[in-house]
Amino acid sequence: HQFEVLGTRLITTFSNNILNNNGFLRRTRPDGLDDRRDMQFMQNGRQVFKQVVPMVSDLIVDHCADEGIDPTGLKRLWLHQANTSMNDFIGKKVMGRVPEPDEQPNILQDYANTSSAGSIIAFSHHQDGLESGDLAVICSFGAGYSAGNVIVRKR
């Protein structure tokens, strides 16, 4: 399989809904402060969901618009593989309908959350069925928040 990269786009925005409360630095202090779980990675999952879904779907839709592509015509969405519900909402916002399973592959059941590699693993395993000229998106996103989007065309 060969693909042409038509465009890339990145976005980063700050959020207090995913953070580390100085926990990793506490371990290095000479005064021996206790290793407190409440000072480590914290995530407000509902708020993350509410902020990331529109951020990522807008990134994809706006990127497609800037490239002259109608996102409802995308043949495949290879999205970050951490939360199926989040991907389903993003897919629906981007495609204007609920994507079919082959249009938005899910690899969580086989690989779990592999961080930003999930979209590339999905891309690697789910290229069949695309024809020359078909347009697709690879999009990874995560904590902070950061997202990267790649629009590709099958050769």
Language model region names:
Residues 53, 57, 75-155:
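Claisen-condensing/thiolase-fold acyl-transfer catalytic domains that form or cleave C-C bonds
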Residues 33-34, 40, 61, 100-106:
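Short, functionally important structural connectors and interaction interfaces within domains
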Residues 1-50, 58, 154-155:
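Condensing-enzyme catalytic core mediating Claisen C-C bond formation in acyl metabolism
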Residues 46, 64, 109:
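Short, flexible active-site loop motifs that bind/organize anionic cofactors or intermediates
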Residues 55, 59-67:
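Stable alpha-helical structural segments in soluble proteins, enriched in small hydrophobic residues
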